[in-house]
Amino acid sequence: MQGLNKDDARKEFGEEQVHIWRRSYDVKPPAETEEQREAYLADRRYNHLDKRMMPYSESLKDTLVRVIPFWTDHISQYLLDGQTVLVSAHGNSIRALIKYLEDVSDEDIINYEIKTGAPLVYELTDDLEVIDKYYL
């Protein structure tokens, strides 16, 4: 669905199918074309990345594989040091992090609603277990 906004994707593929691609745990949307891939990989923001590591399509399961090591190696370390952390990321990365932190099942994640642009605050124990969460 690279390059399509949600409304255009719904018109082309149907609302239910787009919902499944956007929200399910292990269903990938259609892979991007070589032309689409070349266009966004030409963007200088991606120059530092190994192009072979960039997927043609990605499910939430795939995103989780990328997000959790970053949580473990970086974010959690700052929190364990007593620092406050602000995470600003793409919705699917946030969804993966929420799935991990709240232990949301693969089946339940499809209906999990995340407000766009609204700060979500987590209160955690010293062991980084969720005590509470709320939107500002």
PLM regions with names:
Residues 1-136:
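Terminal low-complexity/intrinsically disordered segments and their adjoining alpha-helical capping regions
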